[in-house]
Amino acid sequence: MGVDSGCVGIVGLGLIGGSIGLDLRAQGIKVQGLVHRSSTAERAMERGLVSAVSTDPACLACCDLVILALPIPALLKPNAEFLEALPAEAVVTDVGSVKQPVLQEWKGRHPRFVASHPMAGTAQAGVEAGQRDLFQGRPWIATPDAKTDSAALAVVEDLARRLGSRWFTAAAAQHDQAVALISHMPVLVSAALLRAAGDERDPEIRALAQALASSGFADTSRVGGGNPDLGLAMASSNREAVLKALAAYRWSLEQLE
């Protein structure tokens, strides 16, 4: 079974969920959205993110693939009504940036769950953020374990390749250590840079720095100025690997001194 053989459900229509919906619909695939608020549902339809949308989890009954485009805290504490609505025969995958706790939570909750993570994004969020071709040429990694359904894994690979992504698999622990280095730590370091510049005690120097800041500072600090809740969730859910990465970065700074 491939992605084009039935209906794809997307839970959450922010940047990642909305972008997946746009790309799948462009391929003629039926997309069923599930969101919390009716206002979000209305805007999702206006933007063409989905074929149909609802605030009722029962809408997922028709879906052969369900994509959990949810924040990490929501993935780790799924709603009971939502869990009951997931079809047992459907393939279920997530898009969270931390894999060990998500895999641990979900592998016992659904027999066809595949932990995955598309490595793509922008600084935008919410129902207005979805865009075409977000995943083109970007990595998409799955972290199966010994009990992961191989046919379900193949469906998620088909999804990733349809969206133009480069497909990878790794152990969940390896994924979390790698993204701590190249994704999670940069967010924290960038936020620290913004704070250091903003906390300059001399008001004249601080004002001059703000006036002179240009593309170099913008590029270096961009990821640190994003959604603070997202950064906190990434760091707290991947704490051990992030601390290890920060220790390595601290050592590098000490060598510069």
Regions found by a protein language model. Name each.
Residues 1-57, 61, 65:
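NAD(P)+-binding Rossmann beta1-loop-alpha1 motif at the extreme N-terminus of oxidoreductases
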Residues 4-7, 89, 137:
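Phosphate-coordination loops involved in phosphoryl transfer and adenosine-cofactor binding
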Residues 47-49, 109, 136, 163:
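Short, structured coil segments at secondary-structure junctions
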Residues 57-86, 90-93:
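Rossmann-like NAD(P)-binding element
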Residues 69-71, 96, 144, 192:
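Glycine-rich, N-terminal phosphate-binding loop of Rossmann-like dinucleotide-binding domains
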Residues 78-128:
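Rossmann-like NAD(P)(H) cofactor-binding subdomain of soluble oxidoreductases
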Residues 134-223:
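Internal alpha-helical scaffold of NAD(P)-dependent oxidoreductase catalytic cores
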Residues 205-257:
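Interdomain hinge/lid region at the active-site interface
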